[in-house]
């Protein structure tokens, strides 16, 4: 009985400490290889992930560099074109618009082109009985002058020259200009004086034939432009009816600042 128990005890002890399904070396090797392959896969995935992130960063950096280079070359191209344009203008000159004149201002004083040198001049041709175009353009001029005065100061003379001197004496001009910017200077004169200044600026104007300015009501057909002159009285640029007050102010301010830098 004791021997049976001893055998049974040994058998149980042997069974407990010995695995029912023994692991041979092949299984252990496969297990080790699996862990090794898993680690390799993890490292590969991590490397590929970092490689993908680096590729994205490289693409973004390349794109940003391309945009920066494009903007830089566009800026340089613009500067080159501006220099070329300046050389052309210096060679062939700007259109010969403007010139000497002697007219009467809306206060009744005789003035010449020399009285308006030292500042820029913004000149418009029209007449006081103009129903719509002239008032709109003078409103535009008034707004542009206000902008310029607020940004860079009092650097421009706004000038309104009549194309209808027979009906626009100084007093008529003064009353008409009360509705606009007080800085605007009205200029009138004899028919020949007005004809001469219009010819120098290539301004077209026409009045009906066989009329009496004191009795007949009529309209004057004329071209609609603003003429910007520099402080020496030389022509700079012309602006059509589609130009806004902001366009006028921007141009005046730009030319003023450009001249200021050159001094």
Swiss-Prot record:
<comment type="similarity">
    <text>Belongs to the SCO1/2 family.</text>
</comment>
<keyword id="KW-0999">Mitochondrion inner membrane</keyword>
<dbReference type="InterPro" id="IPR017276">
    <property type="entry name" value="Synth_of_cyt-c-oxidase_Sco1/2"/>
</dbReference>
<keyword id="KW-0472">Membrane</keyword>
<feature type="binding site">
    <location>
        <position position="130"/>
    </location>
    <ligand>
        <name>Cu cation</name>
    </ligand>
</feature>
<protein>
    <recommendedName>
        <fullName>Protein sco1</fullName>
    </recommendedName>
</protein>
<dbReference type="GO" id="GO:0005743">
    <property type="term" value="C:mitochondrial inner membrane"/>
</dbReference>
<dbReference type="GO" id="GO:0005507">
    <property type="term" value="F:copper ion binding"/>
</dbReference>
<keyword id="KW-0496">Mitochondrion</keyword>
<feature type="binding site">
    <location>
        <position position="134"/>
    </location>
    <ligand>
        <name>Cu cation</name>
    </ligand>
</feature>
<keyword id="KW-0479">Metal-binding</keyword>
<dbReference type="GO" id="GO:0006878">
    <property type="term" value="P:intracellular copper ion homeostasis"/>
</dbReference>
<dbReference type="InterPro" id="IPR003782">
    <property type="entry name" value="SCO1/SenC"/>
</dbReference>
<dbReference type="GO" id="GO:0016531">
    <property type="term" value="F:copper chaperone activity"/>
</dbReference>
<keyword id="KW-0143">Chaperone</keyword>
<dbReference type="Pfam" id="PF02630">
    <property type="entry name" value="SCO1-SenC"/>
</dbReference>
<feature type="binding site">
    <location>
        <position position="222"/>
    </location>
    <ligand>
        <name>Cu cation</name>
    </ligand>
</feature>
<comment type="function">
    <text>Acts as a copper chaperone, transporting copper to the Cu(A) site on the cytochrome c oxidase subunit II (COX2).</text>
</comment>
<keyword id="KW-0186">Copper</keyword>
<dbReference type="InterPro" id="IPR036249">
    <property type="entry name" value="Thioredoxin-like_sf"/>
</dbReference>
<dbReference type="GO" id="GO:0033617">
    <property type="term" value="P:mitochondrial cytochrome c oxidase assembly"/>
</dbReference>
């Amino acid at each position: 009985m004791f021997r049976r128990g001893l055998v049974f005890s040994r058998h149980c002890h042997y069974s407990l400490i010995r695995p029912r399904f023994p692991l041979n070396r092949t299984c252990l090797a496969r297990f080790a290889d699996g862990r090794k392959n898993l680690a390799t896969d993890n490292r590969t995935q991590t490397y590929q992930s970092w490689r993908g992130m680096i590729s994205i960063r490289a693409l973004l950096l390349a794109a940003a560099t391309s945009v920066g280079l494009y903007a830089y070359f566009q800026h340089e191209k613009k500067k080159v074109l501006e220099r070329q344009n300046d050389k052309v203008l210096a060679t062939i000159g700007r259109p010969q618009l403007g010139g000497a004149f002697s007219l009467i201002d809306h206060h009744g004083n005789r003035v010449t082109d020399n009285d308006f040198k030292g500042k820029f001049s913004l000149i418009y041709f029209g007449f006081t009985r103009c129903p719509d175009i002239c008032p709109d353009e003078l409103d535009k001029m008034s707004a542009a002058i206000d902008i310029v005065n607020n940004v860079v100061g009092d650097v421009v003379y706004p000038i309104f020259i009549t194309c209808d001197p027979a009906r626009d004496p100084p007093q008529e001009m003064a009353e008409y200009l009360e509705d606009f910017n007080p800085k605007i200077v009205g200029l009138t004169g004899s028919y020949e004086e007005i004809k001469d200044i219009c010819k120098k600026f290539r301004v077209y104007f026409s009045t009906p034939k066989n009329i009496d300015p004191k009795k007949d009501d009529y309209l004057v057909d004329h071209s609609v432009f603003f003429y910007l002159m520099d402080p020496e009285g030389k022509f700079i640029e012309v602006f059509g009816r589609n130009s806004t007050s902001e366009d006028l102010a921007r141009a005046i301010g730009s030319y003023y600042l450009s001249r200021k830098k050159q001094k």
